[in-house]
């Protein structure tokens, strides 16, 4: 059976449109708040409201999928996010935007859980690595194109909201032409997220998602600050961030393919080791382009491989709950990692960014090496 079936391709097509809208709003909302002369702490609180919505959406989506299936859950998530977009134009103010960004955060997380769970349920242990690699490629390409749109079109609030909301609703259209089967057996009891987090044989995958959140959250949030403190111009910062993200895009498919062929344990070990090497290269003031490229190629591909590892350890009817647990783990890592790293950078040195990334990666590498004898190795498929 083909890996990229018609439902998968249509699902990813819709996701691309949604990711464009998400990327544009995530970039412009802080700028719009600043234009309204809101203080830094207010901008931060609105941002936190969005991520709080992410957590709530992640926890709710499993129940929604079980009740109404993948297609209707996807439609509902898209409508919720569209409401969060349109609501920003109803009233401009701190409390209003706090509420609407919370709504948008719920919708955004629901979209992620629905798409990731649908891909997991559509695939097998032979091709889940490639499916998740395709998902991450679409996500990063959409994010990149969203940034490009921001630089090319008017960024006025009432100019952006109509087409961003329209883009979100257009993301529903591809799913109208297919039906993504929810193959969770109805005679199975609901699986709790907590039980998935405690599942011993999937712990390396869960830990990998936490580490991935720490690494990517720190790179996304603090790399521009690191470069700025090094005297790099804003234009050049954009270039170096593009190098980082492009490496992540280019690395998705080959690493997903290798994980499917040679087993996820081996690939995870190599990835984490390369992240450590990339961090050391940045600390040693080596050529920035190759250092950032290998850091991006390895760091940005940790999440899908760790997710595929965890999902092959559970029964088919547990996949949605496991995916919720993994996304929750990633979100927690992406929230805590940058906060802790930023405090270290402020109090000691900017180099703590890469020391932190290398340190958590080294801890995860030790887990991968130590648990090899206790955790069954994923079966390699030619």
Swiss-Prot record:
Q: Which CDD domains match?
A: MFS_YcaD_like
The family database entries (InterPro entries) matched by this protein are listed as: MFS, MFS_dom, MFS_trans_sf, MFS_YcaD, MFS_YcaD-like
Stretches of the chain found on the membrane's Cytoplasmic side: 1-13, 66-78, 123-130, 178-203, 256-269, 312-324, 369-382
Location comes to: Cell inner membrane
Q: What UniProt keywords apply to this chain's record, in alphabetical order?
A: Cell inner membrane, Cell membrane, Membrane, Transmembrane, Transmembrane helix, Transport
Query: Which GO terms of the cellular component aspect does the record hold?
Result: plasma membrane
Q: What is its main location?
A: membrane
Q: Does the keyword Cell membrane apply?
A: yes
- SUPFAM superfamilies, A to Z: MFS general substrate transporter
So which domain of life are we looking at?
A: Bacteria
Q: Where are the transmembrane segments?
A: 14-34, 45-65, 79-99, 102-122, 131-151, 157-177, 204-224, 235-255, 270-290, 291-311, 325-345, 348-368
Q: Which Pfam families match?
A: MFS_1 (PF07690)
What GO molecular function annotation could you give as one example from this UniProt entry? transmembrane transporter activity
Question: Membrane side Periplasmic: which residues?
Answer: 35-44, 100-101, 152-156, 225-234, 346-347
Protein family (similarity comment): Belongs to the major facilitator superfamily. YcaD (TC 2.A.1.26) family.
Q: Which HAMAP family match?
A: MFS_YcaD
This protein is called Uncharacterized MFS-type transporter YcaD
Q: Please name the source species.
A: Escherichia coli O6:H1 (strain CFT073 / ATCC 700928 / UPEC)
What gene name is given for the protein in this entry? Answer: ycaD
